[in-house]
């Protein structure tokens, strides 16, 4: 459970650090804003393919998304 919370915080922090809105990220990766919200809140899991794309958009390594 602790890891789930860490992922939630890391995704939101990475997005904010990249100066992107939830809608902008959703548009870039062709998912709904609701999906981004759920990922950031830890309500749904992010698949590997989406994590890879998010790490590229946020300009951070995939391991940083998990490690904070």
Protein language model annotation of sequence segments:
Residues 16, 27, 56:
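Alpha-helical residues within the helix-turn-helix
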Residues 19-38:
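Short alpha-helical DNA-recognition segment
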Residues 14, 28, 39, 68:
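Residues in the recognition helix of alpha-helical DNA-binding motifs
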């Amino acid at each position: 459970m602790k890891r789930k919370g860490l992922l939630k915080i890391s995704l939101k922090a990475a997005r904010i650090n990249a100066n992107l809105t939830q809608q902008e990220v959703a548009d870039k990766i062709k998912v709904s804003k609701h999906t981004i919200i759920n990922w950031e809140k830890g309500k749904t899991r992010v698949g590997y393919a989406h994590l890879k794309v998010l790490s590229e958009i946020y300009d951070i390594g995939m391991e940083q998304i998990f490690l904070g």
